[in-house]
Swiss-Prot record:
One of its GO terms (molecular function) is structural constituent of ribosome. Binds 23S rRNA and is also seen to make contacts with the A and possibly P site tRNAs. HAMAP family: Ribosomal_uL16. Transmembrane segments: none annotated. GO terms for cellular component: cytosolic large ribosomal subunit. GO terms for biological process: translation. Keywords: Ribonucleoprotein, Ribosomal protein, RNA-binding, rRNA-binding, tRNA-binding. It comes from the Bacteria. This is Large ribosomal subunit protein uL16. Signal peptide: none annotated.
Length: 138
């Protein structure tokens, strides 16, 4: 699982989901990528599920890059607890994703296998995504 090794403050404010991605919106490492089309909080479990879906489909010969990291804690109070008495414990770690952000990149010799693997990875994510190619970018 992807979680930070250490953090300065254990609990943070919830990040904003407005706006578009300022950087990280081009395929730089691989040949194909998964691009977010709407804002979302993506948890470390969802990132891991998408990574496993890619690796199971391509078997060998390709390379996968994960361009997001869940560095923000999301807290939640237990069920049935009244309001007050402090902020709840950390429930999960999230990556704040804005529209336009490239989430995963991949290079593989066969184009149709790579696109199918990225399509399966997109099904594991909580937001709408599209598959982009490196040569399609301007």
């Amino acid at each position: 699982m992807l979680i930070p090794k250490r953090v300065k403050y254990r609990r943070q404010h919830r990040p904003t989901r407005r706006g578009v991605s300022k950087g990280g919106n081009r395929v730089t490492f691989g040949d194909y990528g998964v691009q977010a089309l709407e804002p979302a909080y993506i948890t470390n479990r969802q990132i891991e599920a998408a990574r496993i879906a890619i690796n199971r489909h391509v078997k060998r010969g390709g390379k996968v890059w994960i361009n997001i990291f869940p560095d923000r804690p999301l807290t939640q109070k237990p069920l049935g607890v009244r309001m007050g008495s402090g902020k709840g414990p950390v429930e999960k770690w999230i990556a704040n994703v804005k529209p336009g952000r490239i989430l995963f990149e991949m290079s593989y010799p066969s184009e149709e296998v790579a696109l199918e693997a990225l399509r399966r990875a997109g099904a594991k994510l909580p937001c709408k995504v599209r598959i982009v190619k490196k040569e399609d970018q301007f």
